[in-house]
Each structure stands twice: as C-alpha cells, then as structure tokens.
Amino acid sequence: MTNIITRFAPSPTGFLHIGSARTALFNYLFARHNNGKFFLRIEDTDKKRSTKEAVEAIFSGLKWLGLNWDGEVIFQSKRNSLYKEAALKLLKEGKAYYCFTRQEEIAKQRQQALKDKQHFIFNSEWRDKGPSTYPADIKPVIRLKVPREGSITIHDTLQGEIVIENSHIDDMILIRTDGTATYMLAVIVDDHDMGITHIIRGDDHLTNAARQIAIYHAFGYEVPNMTHIPLIHGADGTKLSKRHGALGVEAYKDMGYLPESLCNYLLRLGWSHGDDEIISMNQAIEWFNLASLGKSPSKLDFAKMNSINSHYLRMLDNDSLTSKTVEILKQNYKISEKEVSYIKQAMPSLIVRSETLRDLAQLAYIYLVDSPMIYSQDAKEVINNCDKDLIKQVIENLSKLEQFNKECVQNKFKEIAIYNGLKLNDIMKPVRALITGMTASPSVFEIAETLGKENILKRLKIIYYNNLNF
C-alpha cells in the first residue's frame, strides 16, 4: 500500500473552530492508523484576513489536543513563486490563458444571467486569443482553460461517485492581477508537492472538488483519495453557529474540558466503533477507518460532552485534579499552600459533583479562606431570611467543641435541631449559605472538618457585619 499522507490545511482568519478540530483529528488518526504522515499547512493566501494571532491559535489548539504534526509547517504565503511557475507551465502548454476582462464587465454579465434566471458561467473572450491582441494598459489574470466537452467524476469514499459536466465548470482564476496565486491553484500545487494521498475535509468543500480535479488533470497529477465528511450541526439540526457552541478549541479549554475528553467527543461526532462511547487516543488510532464514518450530520450535544468529560476527570488521580483546579483558581486569586492542602483533602467530595475543571474550581473556591467570600443570589436570600438567633446558637455550640471532625459537628447540629424542634435541614440551609456562599455544595460537615473551627466560625459570624448589604 502507498504510504499514507494526510494534511490539515486551515486558513488563519480566526480561532481553531471545533469543526476544524474534528477534521484535524480525523486526518491525524487516519495517518497514524496507517503508519503514515500527518502534515500541517497554513493557507494564508488571503493577506487581508490572515493574522499571526490566528496562526498561533491553530498551533496551540492542535498541540493542546495532542494532534502533533510531522515535519515543518507549510505556509502558502512563502510559496507564491512556485505557484506562478506552475501557472506559467500551464500557459506554455495551452492549458491556461491570460484574461483581460475587467471585473466590472464580469459583474455585469453575472447580473444579466441572474435577471434571465440562468446559471452563470463566465466565458472569456480571451480564451483563444494570442499575444498580438493583448491590451497594454490592463493587468491580466491567468485562467485555467477547462475543456468544453466531457465531465469530471469525483470519487468520494463517503459520498460515492459524483459526475459534473465540464460545461458547468468555469475557467477559474489561477493567478490574480497582482501576481498572487488563488486558493484553487495553491492547494493543488501544495498537495502534489507534499505527496498528499488522502484528503479528508468537510462536505462544504465538495462544491470545490470538481474544479480542483480539473486543475489536477491539467497538470497531469494523480488525484488524491477524497472523503468529504458531513458538517457538525447544532442541537436543533441547523448549521452550527456561535449560539450552538461553535467556539474555538481555546474556549473549550477555558470552559474546563480535558483535551483527551474533547478528542473522544469529536471522534464520536461522525465516527463509531460499535457501541463504544469512551475511546482513548490509542484505541482511536488502532480502530480508525474511513468506512465507519457516518453520512449524516452530527449534532453538538453539551450533555454528552459533559458526560464524557466527567468520565475522564474521574480517571485522574487526586494530585492531578488538585493541580489542574489550583491552576485555574490562580488565574484570579492568590492561593496559599494551606489552601492547596484544603482543596486536595476535599477533592473526593468535589469531583463527584463536577463535570468540568471549571465546576471543580467553582466548588474549590469554598476552601480559599484568605479570599473574600462570594455569595450567590440564592444564598443571599437565604441569609436575609434566616433566624439570626439560631445562627448565634450554632456559633456558641460549635465554639465549645473540642473535637471538630465531621461526626462531632454533625452530632452537634442534630442536638441544636432537636433542642429547637426543627428539622436538621432548617438549620443547615442558612449555615450552608454562610459557610459556602451557595445553596448546594458538598457536605457542610466535611467542609467543617477540612477548614477547621476558626475558619467556620469566622464565616458564620459574618452575618453580623452590617456592610454586607445582604
């Protein structure tokens, strides 16, 4: 079998989109499964829209996901001389031509076709003219001379055979008036020079496939195997947008998802291995094949994403979870070694209530005794409506405890409840709000044991401060 070579070729015009990350993943897995190569190419021919920041976002996103590429990164912006050389070769062979038609004239023809309700294909008057007719005052483009007769067949692994008549393919521009290559030319020259054997990309590129094959044929290049995968849709079945969660990979990292989890989730968006839901990267490399790709669009499902992420979180040991949680908290707060030890001790009770690292960090804030308390709106309402005399009893009773472990604290609260003819929850509700700033949290008794008497009493006494404006 020919050595498999795939590529991921994003345009650096923004963040690494979640759909693009899936495309990169599929190319990476197919190459690794076949002991092939996975290359990265930056398609930055659009100078106005391409940015260095976007390039860095692509690099960091791929590295974070663990999709490490082979060899040096290819930048199209550094290869324009090669594209011009290739276009001139086609000119010399009569497979391309100089076109001097102004854009205004083409726009006029397009408007007329629209008015006549006809499909517009630009037919250049310069297609068969020679140098003696060339105007001196107009800079030309170089166009591909697509054969008038015949058809082009797209052989797609997933979509099957698609036949496009040549009469429906325009003489596309290869070199612009400023001498720069178009995307259509650059991608063919690059794929050939890089030895790409398989192209795996979104089916939004299917409309370009026939035009690109026409360029392959003009050069006499072998056409790579093509697989056009359905795009990811939102939960409502419509095209994925920001309102659905069409964010960059960096955003998912910031939201507290693990890279292994996100790769697992993206893999299952359009590819399956029986009923397996949890698939490690090593298993994915071993099992991945194009035959198991789905033909229907997948829907972005955050509930499923969270479920998979929680599984991967629970696979981490206590030290790793603590380290990752503290790393997030340190973005906004100073964390002492004492507080790190509190979080580590509490981690077993935090992880069972968390689906993401952000969830963990939010709960772990309870243990930052040197930072100001943060109260949810619900917690503030509970505190405003609570019986302050009851809280005073709690403070007095807890102050007398010699042992401050969870059993002793729990027993003391039960005694207070019985003494006041209350249910335990009637007391714990305002106590939880004061100690954690939340109305739902890990066990207050476990929190009390971890933080100790002094910190717990300090938080309970805050109810007497007049400047809180609860």
From Swiss-Prot:
Motif, 'KMSKS' region: chain positions: 239-243
GO cellular component, one term: cytosol
Localization terms from the record: Cytoplasm
InterPro entries given in the database record: aa-tRNA-synth_I_cd-bd, aa-tRNA-synth_I_codon-bd_sub2, aa_tRNA-synth_I_cd-bd_sf, Glu-tRNA-ligase_bac/mito, Glu/Gln-tRNA-synth, Glu/Gln-tRNA-synth_Ib_cat-dom, GluQ/Sye, GluRS_core
Key words of the record: Aminoacyl-tRNA synthetase, ATP-binding, Cytoplasm, Ligase, Nucleotide-binding, Protein biosynthesis
Top-level class of the enzyme under EC nomenclature: ligase
Biological process terms in GO annotation: glutamyl-tRNA aminoacylation
Motif 'HIGH' region per record, residues: 10-20
Binding site for ATP: 242
GO molecular function, one term: glutamate-tRNA ligase activity
Catalytic activity as recorded in UniProt: tRNA(Glu) + L-glutamate + ATP = L-glutamyl-tRNA(Glu) + AMP + diphosphate
Residues annotated as signal peptide: none
EC number: 6.1.1.17
NCBIfam families for this protein: gltX_bact
Subunit structure: Monomer.
Function, as annotated: Catalyzes the attachment of glutamate to tRNA(Glu) in a two-step reaction: glutamate is first activated by ATP to form Glu-AMP and then transferred to the acceptor end of tRNA(Glu).
Protein family per UniProt: Belongs to the class-I aminoacyl-tRNA synthetase family. Glutamate--tRNA ligase type 1 subfamily.
Protein name (database record): Glutamate--tRNA ligase 2
Lineage, opening ranks: Bacteria, Pseudomonadati, Pseudomonadota, Alphaproteobacteria, Rickettsiales
